[in-house]
UniProtKB/Swiss-Prot annotation:
Protein name: Large ribosomal subunit protein bL34
Coiled-coil intervals: none
Domain of life: Bacteria
Keywords in alphabetical order: Ribonucleoprotein, Ribosomal protein
Organism: Prochlorococcus marinus (strain MIT 9301)
Region (Disordered): 1-45
Upper lineage: Bacteria, Bacillati, Cyanobacteriota, Cyanophyceae, Synechococcales
HAMAP family: Ribosomal_bL34
GO BP term, pick one: translation
Similarity field: Belongs to the bacterial ribosomal protein bL34 family.
Gene Ontology CC terms: ribonucleoprotein complex; ribosome
One of the record's GO molecular function terms: structural constituent of ribosome
């Protein structure tokens, strides 16, 4: 069987793709906007 290689670090995940990081840049805000329009339950991590 294959190993589960993805560990997942919550601090790193927040720093890369958290809400506050998204709001910093123009493109990040565009991501938030499009996810809101689509009706995503989770806008950001």
């Amino acid at each position: 069987m294959t190993k589960r290689t993805f560990g997942g670090t919550s601090r790193k995940r927040k720093r890369v793709s958290g809400f506050r990081v998204r709001m910093r840049s123009h493109t990040g805000r565009r991501v938030i906007k499009s996810r809101r329009q689509k009706g995503r339950e989770r806008i950001a991590v």
